[in-house]
């Protein structure tokens, strides 16, 4: 019983640790992971060596905006996972299928999921949108992110041609409906995130200490 009590206290301490500390830990941790993948990309001379610049910039940008967007460490962690999942393309994951579905679907859906979670929290705490319009705004912004990404990819494909990574056209991009499918997948992820957050807020608002950790 004494040991169980100590374990419980440790878990509580971890859950309620200052969010600023967690965000710093997550920033450092995923920076190290991205650097490690970058070394491999340089070693094999993969085009993913250029993606490192954009991924690290995104990670740092979100971190520096953490106060304005009320960034939660759990959401920041999920974003870091997305960045790593994308960069795992250096191992040719985008040309493979997992659970019968192409890798590109999982990554785009996951990005929509994470983005919607972050936006939902921001709008709940500081955003001007309320009610059902909040959900529409989240979907619109996620699709906006997706559209920007597709235009960025298109510009890279036109200027640089075939290759790997976000700047080139390669595995996962050859379908003539790739843009529409990517945006659809982002939308799927966003809708799932909205459903999860809405359901949690409606049915489990009193859970402690997890409520404090998640919110």
Language-model-detected regions and their locations in the chain:
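N-terminal amphipathic/basic-hydrophobic helices that include classical n-h-c signal peptides
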Residues: 1-16
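Bulky hydrophobic segments
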Residues: 13-164, 169-171, 187-215
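Membrane-interface transmembrane-helix boundary segments in multi-pass integral membrane proteins
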Residues: 175-188
């Amino acid at each position: 019983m004494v040991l169980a009590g100590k374990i419980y206290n440790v878990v509580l301490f971890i859950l309620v640790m200052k969010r600023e500390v967690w965000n710093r830990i997550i920033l450092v941790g995923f920076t190290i992971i991205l650097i490690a993948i970058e070394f491999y990309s340089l070693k094999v001379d993969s085009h993913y060596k250029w993606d490192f610049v954009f991924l690290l910039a995104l990670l740092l940008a979100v971190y520096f905006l953490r106060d304005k967007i009320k960034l939660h460490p759990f959401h920041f962690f999920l974003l870091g996972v997305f960045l790593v999942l994308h960069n795992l393309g250096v191992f040719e994951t985008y040309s493979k299928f997992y659970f019968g579905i192409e890798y590109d679907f999982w990554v785009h859906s996951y990005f929509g999921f994470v983005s919607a979670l972050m936006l939902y929290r921001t709008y709940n705490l500081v955003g001007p949108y309320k009610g059902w319009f909040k959900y529409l705004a989240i979907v619109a912004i996620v699709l906006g992110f997706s559209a920007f990404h597709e235009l960025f990819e298109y510009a890279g494909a036109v200027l640089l041609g075939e290759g790997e990574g976000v700047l080139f056209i390669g595995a996962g991009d050859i379908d003539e409906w790739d843009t529409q499918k990517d945006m659809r997948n982002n939308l799927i992820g966003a809708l799932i995130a909205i459903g999860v957050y809405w359901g949690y807020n409606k049915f489990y608002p009193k859970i402690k200490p997890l409520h404090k950790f998640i919110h």
